[in-house]
Amino acid sequence: MGNEDFLNKIIHGDSMKLLDKLEENSIDVVLTDPPYFLDKMDNNWDDDTVSSTDNHYAVKSLPAGMKFDRKHGIKFYEWYFEIAKKIKKILKPGGFFFSFSSPRLYHRMGCAVDDAKLLIRDCFIWLYSMNQPKAMSLNHFIDKMEVEEEVKEKIKDELDGWKTPKVKSCFEPILMAQKKQDKTYLNNILKHGVGLFNTKVKIGEDMFPANVMKIEEGHEILDRYFLVPKPDKEEKGEFNTHKTVKPLKICEYLIKLSAFSDNAIILDPFVGSGTTAVAAKKLNKKFIGIDVNKEYVEIAKKRLENV
């Protein structure tokens, strides 16, 4: 099986297995949003496990009731290290790897990609404000204390406003890495058609490409450069049940920034509802999308039909 069996298709399957079937040194850009936790199953999941769950979706943060443990981060590192090694193998020399992450696990992702011998180039920041604070009051636990009510009320008054150490999350990091180029940048772009950034690409007005992007209106000056629309129902599709759909504009921006060749292949090994593939198709680039979730594969295919 070669790339021709994957090109411009959404494939249902496990990327840990399918990435080995892609040709070496053949992918221009990898743009993906990997799963971190899947219904309290960490990364020990497969198609049968996903299909047997009631709510089979990948989420960025911990599922309700699940406590974060260092083991989760370690398991994620071990899993993504193997993924990153496979990605390095199939990327062209100078090819780019963009991976959405979360503040809590970005360091594990960065170490996994770095240890796979890909070059960490930068970190893009996607800013937003539409998110709920997750800090928790301790009143519920105070109520369970076996002490007099007056003592409970006194403790509550003393701890008024003091909650668990969790702030409102307002950004999402996007790791940017690159496979080592073949000799010089000039040699690499002429031989492999990848490895440079298109500095004419802007999110806003009259500014060199930046690594900060925001999706809501705010400061007037920032809005000139970093405004990225939040995906609405029309963009996602009324049928789209995916929980963490990324803005199409961000994916388009990263592809336009990094994909030089007209024949560039954009790979998303965790394609979800297909935003990366939709962006690539809109920009007349070739794409490969892979996902273990059958429901998301069908959603992605349906979204592509509307492009």
Task: Name each model feature, range by range.
Residues 12-17:
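Conserved SAM/SAH-binding loop
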Residues 3-9:
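A short helix-to-beta-strand connector/capping loop
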Residues 7, 28-32, 36-85, 96-99, ...:
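Class I S-adenosyl-L-methionine
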Residues 1-2, 296:
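Enriched but not universal
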Residues 18-24:
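Short conserved loop adjoining the S-adenosyl-L-methionine
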